[in-house]
Amino acid sequence: VKKQEGKTEDYTWLNRFGNMGTFLKNDIKLIRRNKRSRTTVIISALFLLYGLFFFTGSVEMYETPVMWVFAGIFVSGGFLFTFGQYVPSWDSSYYPLMMSQNIQYREYLNSKWYLIVIATIVSTLLSVFYLYFGWHAYLAIVVGAIYNVGVNSYLVLWGGAYIKTPIDLTSNKKAFGDSQAFNVKTLLLTIPKLLLPLLVFWLGNWIWNETAGYLMVALAGVAGFAFREPVFRLIEKIYKKEKYKTLSAYREKAA
């Protein structure tokens, strides 16, 4: 039995993706083996229940289509917000070693992006029970997922370049958030993550109707996906620029 478990742990099926597959294997092992990362995944799963505040009519101020879009962003993006925004801090313990091996930032970032996208899709599928509260509830979640994949997935990786706080994988301390991980740049990136989709929906709803609002938010996500290559080049450039500051911060905290 132990031999079979060890073989399963190898995730050899990811080898077909080259170096990116290696990064994905490392992330999966990190999540499975460490207390902090497992707790983060559990917290991200709890985001699936966040929509109950918005779609059940329990809170009157949330009974508006704009707030439904807000809920959709969070329900589908639990992993994106709890895990994604702390890239590359998850790898802080061996980040200097990785950098000494001259890894390709594109492959590293791609692996994180795919992990976020897969988690977003899984969250969206698991939230299908919201159809019980009406088609508008699940539509808001699907639209939120499209925006998360096409826009927010880039923004969390972008913001991660400015976070210089290492993560202790053996401890659940600050598992619900670390104030040191926020700065002016990361806070500014919060605007397009949370407020821009609400503004886009509001404009579509105001000019035309609710359906147009949902469509415009979804199109914003599709447009972001279409510009994936230039956006990744920009993010890669930022990571390279911040490389030595990040390494210095991790080494300083480890000392």
Predicted regions span which residues?
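Short helix-to-coil transition segments within interhelical loops
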Residues: 99-104
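A glycine- and small/hydrophobic-rich beta-loop-beta segment
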Residues: 95
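Hydrophobic alpha-helical transmembrane segments of membrane proteins
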Residues: 1-91, 105-255
